[in-house]
């Protein structure tokens, strides 16, 4: 409340980006805490934990990049890397393989479950950066709306992890409002 009352209206998108990032990292940490807790071994909880970590990590690092571009800490120019689509696709496939390993614990990767979790966190953080960096500063409001939707989905998934109905509903509302805002922002683009 204090931060939002002290920030100028022209800096509100940066604040929203930070709030989205905090929501993403909070959801990610809930997922990690519940995964490390040995009593959370039900199949549904493992699916929710994996989804929470995946979306929470992407939201956190993507929101930090969006904040940096809007506040001009990072250049607002799009950062295009050579072979970016191949790198992003490969990272996404590897993240999904890690999610399946977390859920089913097949042992095919020859890694401990905790190692798989922390590798997944690293990949999701990298994905958030690589998905947000190629977008120019002028399109950041659209990205922030999408990340708002992601933070709501991560919060809702965290609600499933800890069996909290209020968090499930609140996250779903934030996710839905972010999705509506994203579609209306994207519709204004030529």
Ranges and model annotations:
Residues 45-57, 171-176:
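Alpha-helical transmembrane segments
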Residues 182-190:
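Conserved small/polar residues in nucleotide/adenosyl-binding loops
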Residues 49-57, 113-122:
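Structural signature of hydrophobic alpha-helical transmembrane segments
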Residues 1-2, 55-63, 90-101, 121-130, ...:
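Hydrophobic core segments of alpha-helical transmembrane domains in multi-pass membrane transport
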Residues 2-11, 30-41, 106:
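Transmembrane alpha-helix boundary signature
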Residues 1-13, 63-78, 127-137:
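C-terminal ends of transmembrane helices
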Residues 33-41, 142, 150-169:
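Transmembrane helix-loop junctions at the membrane interface of multipass transporters and ion channels
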Residues 11-22, 78-88, 141-148:
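Cytoplasmic-side transmembrane-helix entry/capping segments in multi-pass membrane proteins
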């Amino acid at each position: 409340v204090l931060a939002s009352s002290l920030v100028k209206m022209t800096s509100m998108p940066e604040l929203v980006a930070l709030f989205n990032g905090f929501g993403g990292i909070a959801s990610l940490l809930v997922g990690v805490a519940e995964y490390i807790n040995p009593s959370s071994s039900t199949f549904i909880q493992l699916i929710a934990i994996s989804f929470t970590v995946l979306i929470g990590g992407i939201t956190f690092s993507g929101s930090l990049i969006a904040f940096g571009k809007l506040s001009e800490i990072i250049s607002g120019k799009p950062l295009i890397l050579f072979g970016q689509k191949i790198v992003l696709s490969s990272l996404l496939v590897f993240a999904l393989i890690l999610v399946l390993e977390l859920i089913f614990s097949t042992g095919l990767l020859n890694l401990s479950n905790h190692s798989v979790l922390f590798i997944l966190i690293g990949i999701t953080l990298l994905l958030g950066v690589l998905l947000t960096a190629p977008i120019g500063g002028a399109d950041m409001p659209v990205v922030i709306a999408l990340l708002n939707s992601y933070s709501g989905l991560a919060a809702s998934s965290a609600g499933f992890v800890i069996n909290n109905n209020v968090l499930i509903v609140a996250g779903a509302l934030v996710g839905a409002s972010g999705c509506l805002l994203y579609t209306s922002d994207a519709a204004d683009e030529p």
